[in-house]
């Protein structure tokens, strides 16, 4: 991004926390950034930048757009937290020029909850894939089957179900291995080290170019709990790799069932294993 001429401004954010003090700090940080750089337009991504960035733009009278890349776990539950998020989204979305969605179900949820005027809603069907960068790759001929996971290693990505399914395969003496790419949440550091020693997982950290790993993979796996539109599914499909992914909006669109891949139940390691 820097090579393209972009200016990078780091904004510390607690992605999963609900501490009001921390979130107010983020809001005022956004306000100060807007005051300093005076942008013509702001495009916000993900829940906290959408909400607090949107509110900061309203306060500073800056034009802005929201991009809903997924609704997160809070939208799948009932209770005070969901009600609060819906209320904040309504405030943040009120003056937005447009609200982009990456799948129809997320847009439908916003319509049902009447978060903003429907005239603002635009469906993108994902961020898209550069098919010259992710072109068809010959299928590997290795005897050992390589499953591939790319993403943040966290509970909501379905990694617990994935690890359970892989352990079951490995216990049956199947000749397979799971290649894992991405940063991990603190809870998973010890687990990853343990599974590597057991021999069925290889952790490669964050990779700026995933193509060598996609080329080696026999199958891409993403058992996520929720997604906007999973680009890693699209990139793997564009490269000619079968996919196993969750039967949820944002994942299932990338698969023709039993032809280009398989769909599994969300939060179900047995379904994933089968």
Annotate each predicted stretch with a short phrase.
Residues 1-4, 108, 168-171, 177-204:
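Short, structured helix-loop element that forms part of the nucleotide-activated donor/catalytic region
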Residues 9-10, 90-136:
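Donor nucleotide-sugar binding/catalytic pocket of nucleotide-sugar-dependent glycosyltransferases
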Residues 21-28, 63-65, 73-95:
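Nucleotide-sugar donor phosphate/pyrophosphate-binding loop at the beta->alpha transition
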Residues 44-50, 68:
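Short His-centered aromatic/hydrophobic patch
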Residues 138-157, 162-167:
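Conserved donor-binding/catalytic core segment of Leloir-type glycosyltransferases
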Residues 206, 225:
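Aromatic "clamp/platform" in nucleotide-sugar-dependent glycosyltransferases that forms part
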Residues 242-245, 255:
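Short hydrophobic beta-strand element within catalytic cores of glycosyltransferases
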Residues 257-258, 262-269:
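Conserved acidic donor-binding segment of nucleotide-sugar-dependent glycosyltransferases
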């Amino acid at each position: 991004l820097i090579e393209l001429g972009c200016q990078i401004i780091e904004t510390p954010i607690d992605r999963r926390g609900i501490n009001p003090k921390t979130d107010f700090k983020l809001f005022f940080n956004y306000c100060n950034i807007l005051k300093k750089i005076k942008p013509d337009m702001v495009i916000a991504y993900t829940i906290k930048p959408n909400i607090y960035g949107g509110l900061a733009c309203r306060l500073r009278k800056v034009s802005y757009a929201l991009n809903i890349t997924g609704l997160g776990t809070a939208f799948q539950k009932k209770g005070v937290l969901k009600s609060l998020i819906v209320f904040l989204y309504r405030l943040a979305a009120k003056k937005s020029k447009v609200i982009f969605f990456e799948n129809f179900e997320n847009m439908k949820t916003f319509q049902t909850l009447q978060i903003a005027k429907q005239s603002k809603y635009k469906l993108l069907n994902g961020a898209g894939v550069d098919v010259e960068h992710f072109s068809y790759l010959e299928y590997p001929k290795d005897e050992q089957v390589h499953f591939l996971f790319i993403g943040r290693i966290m509970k909501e990505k379905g990694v617990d179900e994935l690890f359970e399914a892989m352990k079951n395969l490995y216990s049956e003496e199947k000749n397979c291995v799971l290649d894992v790419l991405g940063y991990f949440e603190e809870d998973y550091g010890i687990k990853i080290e343990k599974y590597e020693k057991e021999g069925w997982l290889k952790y490669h950290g964050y990779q700026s170019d995933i193509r060598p790993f996609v080329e080696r993979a026999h199958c891409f796996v993403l058992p996520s709990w929720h997604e906007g539109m999973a680009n890693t599914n699209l990139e793997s499909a564009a490269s000619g790799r079968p996919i196993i992914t969750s039967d949820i909006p944002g994942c299932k669109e990338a698969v023709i069932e039993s032809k280009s891949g398989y769909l599994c139940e969300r939060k179900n390691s047995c379904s994933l294993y089968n």
